[in-house]
Each structure stands twice: as C-alpha cells, then as structure tokens.
C-alpha cells in the first residue's frame, strides 16, 4: 500500500463539517448530512472500486471553509501512478477541490503529525453588495474599535488553558494550547472595485484576523473571534480577557462567531515528516 497526501480546498456552506456524522441512535428516520470527508471518500471509492478511509488534519465545523485542509489515505501500490488530483476532482462536487496530491512516507499522518495550523476569519465592513461566493466573510455594519481588538488579541497569545473557548462535545486530556500569533490584515480594499474619479482614501472594506497555534479546541477560533468582536463593540474591555481565560468557564466568554467567516488556511508539518508546502 502507498500513502497519499491531499491538500483540499472547499466551500463549507452546504456541508455539516469535515467529519462524517454518526446517525443518532433511536432515530430511524434521521437523514445523513453531507460532509466533506464523505465526499472525498466517495470520490476515492469510485476510482478504487472499494471503500477507503480518508483522515483529515482538522475537523472543520459545519459551514467552515478551507483553502489548505490536509488529508491522507492509503491506496494500492498499483494505483500510485494515477494522477490523483485530476482523478478525484473529476468525481468531486464543484465546491470541493483537490489542490495537490502526492505519495508520502508510510508513517505520515495528516492529523497527528501536524505541528501548527492557521485559520483566518474575515469580516465585511460595508453595506455595499458583494457576491457571497466572492469571499467567505461575516457582514458587519457597525463601528469596531480595532485598537481594542488588537489589545485583546495580544492577551490571547501564548500558552494558556483555553477551556473558556471550547464548546461542549469533545473529551480531551488537556485544554492547554499555544497560540503563536493573532494578526490582522486588510482583505478586499475599496480599490478592488470600480469607482468614479474620486481618489479620496477610503477605509478597507474587509478585515481578516489570522490565528496560528499548535492546535485548536472545538470551535476555539470562532469563540476567540467572538470575544474579539465583543471587545470591538464595547461589550468588554481588553483587560477583561486574562480573567476570562483564567476562569476556564465557557459561560463567561462571548457567543461563538458565525461559521461562515472562518477558513482553514494551512496545516504545517515538520520538515523531517513531509516536505514544506511551497
């Protein structure tokens, strides 16, 4: 058998997340919700003629997008020469795309070998219309105190127990994680869109927050973003963040930010395990 590594992009809007969902016991009429993992497994099965398990690096939530999800699967050696990127894309729906496919060492594991992940959360800051498929974002029209949000983000970086930012539903040995950075960049700018001869400088139409960590708890990025939005709208002060972290109580933090603004950007691996992404 050969191990195949995939880098996958998808629009998560119509999927119940990455992971295949188990039907609840005692509900014979329950409907299986579509997931990205199931779609990729179905595509691989159509090529191989038999079922195969696909392992993802991260279990993105329902409605969350990806530009760099990593997965692996095992294929017969005789199929290693197949152009897997093209073959899978021919079987996948149009909102899922395999960007890269390559045979890697047998010991590679998409989830357990990951050393860092990057997620981006985008906010659209104007009433101006833009096609939803143009970019994943959350639409906001009120003012945001960006300086306060940056200050709050600084308190969230470092190694902490992030239990206050984990939603229920996952049992873990530890809720300690290391957040390497939370940075902010402008996304789409006004000059990306046609306008008149007016050259007056205009504020960005979109802002993006980038989160990098050794790993994230269930809905941790969306919960951190929810607290940043609380701070930006004056619901709490940046100086409140350390106490919220220390409390280890999800009820004391902000509501979870909507899934539609979040994208899994990239998964990082050590060089000795897998060549760095170009």
Swiss-Prot record:
GO annotation (BP), single: tRNA pseudouridine synthesis
Positions that bind substrate: 119
InterPro entries in the cross-refs: PsdUridine_synth_cat_dom_sf, PsdUridine_synth_TruA, PsdUridine_synth_TruA_a/b_dom, PsdUridine_synth_TruA_C, TruA/RsuA/RluB/E/F_N
Keywords: Isomerase, tRNA processing
Pfam families the record matches: PseudoU_synth_1
Catalysed reactions, semicolon-separated: uridine(38/39/40) in tRNA = pseudouridine(38/39/40) in tRNA
Active site: 61 (nucleophile)
Subunit note: Homodimer.
Family note: Belongs to the tRNA pseudouridine synthase TruA family.
NCBIfam families named among the record's database cross-references: hisT_truA (TIGR00071)
Protein name: tRNA pseudouridine synthase A
Designated gene of the protein: truA
């Amino acid at each position: 058998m050969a191990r195949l590594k995939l880098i996958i992009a998808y629009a998560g809007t119509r999927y119940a997340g990455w992971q295949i969902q188990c039907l609840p016991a005692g509900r014979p009429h329950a409907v299986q919700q579509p997931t990205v993992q199931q779609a990729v497994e179905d595509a691989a099965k159509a090529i191989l003629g038999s079922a195969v398990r696909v392992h993802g690096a991260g279990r993105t939530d329902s409605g969350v997008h990806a530009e760099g999800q990593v997965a692996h699967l095992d294929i017969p050696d005789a199929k290693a020469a197949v152009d897997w990127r093209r073959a899978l894309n021919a079987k996948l729906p149009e909102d899922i795309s395999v960007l890269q496919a390559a045979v890697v060492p047998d010991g590679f594991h998409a989830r357990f070998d990951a050393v860092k992940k990057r997620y981006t959360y985008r906010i659209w800051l104007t009433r101006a219309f833009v096609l939803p498929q143009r970019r994943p974002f959350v639409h906001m029209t009120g003012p945001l105190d960006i300086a306060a949000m940056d200050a709050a983000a600084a308190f969230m970086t470092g190694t902490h127990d992030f239990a206050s930012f984990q939603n229920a539903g996952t049992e873990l040995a530890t809720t300690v994680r290391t957040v390497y950075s939370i940075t902010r960049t402008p996304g789409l700018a006004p000059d990306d869109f046609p306008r008149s001869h007016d050259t007056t400088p205009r504020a960005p139409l979109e802002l993006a927050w980038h989160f990098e960590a050794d790993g994230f708890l269930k809905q941790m990025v969306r919960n951190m973003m929810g607290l940043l939005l609380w701070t930006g709208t004056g619901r709490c002060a940046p100086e409140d963040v350390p106490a919220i972290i220390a409390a280890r109580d999800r009820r004391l933090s902000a509501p979870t930010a909507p899934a539609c603004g979040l994208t899994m950007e990239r998964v990082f691996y050590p060089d000795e395990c897998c060549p760095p992404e170009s």
